[in-house]
């Protein structure tokens, strides 16, 4: 039996017995015991941190220098790819981070985008690209909205002026855009899973590159992150998980309970010490030894180790360690010295298994207007860097999101059983407005759409009337819960699906293309869509009145069209399954669904200007369909065109299914669907996206003329 001294500070100055075979020397133990005095290292590193904190130069942002014109960036100007960073000194790396932050502020001020998250990871981005060798080493950015500094350092700086614009750079990481974007993102909580897959694939291929998954900014509230960590701990493949902890749970309007506690010198020094290679390798050996001992000795060693981890890393390490990840932290995510030191140690340590580095950052770091804002400038329009003022265009109408919130508040005023649920998107869904009025009846579950849906199902079981407000594209994340926990049990949960259809600059990851297709196939679901903001009020009232089955409705991003709203913002419940005719015409009928009705009305004006008066109808419901309306249109017109801002398999498919079974296609009727094309449409302006999708009024009018054999007129309306 040999004695191994763990010389931790304070109460951990104790001797722990560890079994070893005296006949077999253990050079790792002896080298570490004789060459490492932890208390001495601790005090030494504490002194180093204190000295360093007194010599750090003020950054451009801390000096109050913000530029309406492009700021001077002499070091960034020399960096085209990460390889150009490798010979920079630590002082130059700090200046690089300052310049990178200023450059990010300037670029986003011209394009708009996700600013706060990118500012929070500047130092981390510099450290990662300095220590690791991308693209051979895989660096994954969860969600991807914090990837702007990464894009600047990986050959895309000159294109930053095209960010989120048509044919420009994406606002998230995108595999087809750069080899440095090893995994495409846009939704949260995916990178640990993807990174683990890459790590296992690397091992099976016999390679030795590093895999680093950066996750945080609210993404750790999603179950997939924990599923991935659980599997990572079991598979024990080498990978690094960096927890970017900016205390952000809800996006983009969460406010903090108080200031983020500072990551002090003690935590910094101990975290660097814990990443020390001899200590980690010792723990690997000790782990194997204690497994052989068994019994009380094993339990004692485990308790001492657990307490040591608590002393070294502060709070929060137990969960990650229990999942099988070696925990290091918390680390100051804005201290390049510490980040580089720890990343180098972790990279060079020859031990197996996943490592989690807990990095504490501040969203909006280095830009006071972002730091002071409640939303940390999570997503911004174009703005003046010198004042922080955003150039938001004045609109005569409010957004559909706001109209939905007002409609739901009006319903909740009259019905105390109405409650609201959202998944970390209070501002994005308008539920922050509902929260102000009904603080005990609004539930933010974090980025956890699966839980949100089943939580709403439980509320419905108790007689409440839940409205679950989730973006259309995020509803995809909870589809099994919609089917199994809601529709199968016929529970009256109401799904408000914002951002339906094309969404402009956010691109295909946020495009609400598929909700009608995957909702309308469910046997018990009522599926609705308003054609304007007044209809939205009526459909919210309709959903509140449907209490014997689930229902859903979609509405677009953007502002209303300016129609008169219902008195008192209180909608009137519609007859379920009944549409309406808006314009009476002949020969041709345009049957629109949702906001596409407005495109149909505009197309009708184009056709009328060329002598063709067409019928325009608003379906209102995809399920149940207004069969009487469809029969009437089919029998009284030569051509029926269904128009929707959704994918194949949606509203038009349900219409033609009914018409085929009803025999309405057995005669001379010509039916044509206009839907989103069967491909993902890249980010761009709403007008450009609509044109690419073939859903402009001119496209609809040209389709009508082509069906009628009037090809010349079709060409003319497109020019």
From Swiss-Prot:
Binding sites annotated in the UniProt record for Mg(2+): 217, 246
Keyword Transcription tagged: no
Free-text comment on the cofactor: Binds 1 Mg(2+) ion per subunit.
Required cofactor(s): Mg(2+); thiamine diphosphate
Family annotation (Gene3D superfamilies): 3.40.50.920, 3.40.50.970
Annotated compartments: Plastid, Chloroplast
Entry protein name: Probable 1-deoxy-D-xylulose-5-phosphate synthase, chloroplastic
Organism: Capsicum annuum (Capsicum pepper)
Gene this chain is encoded by: TKT2
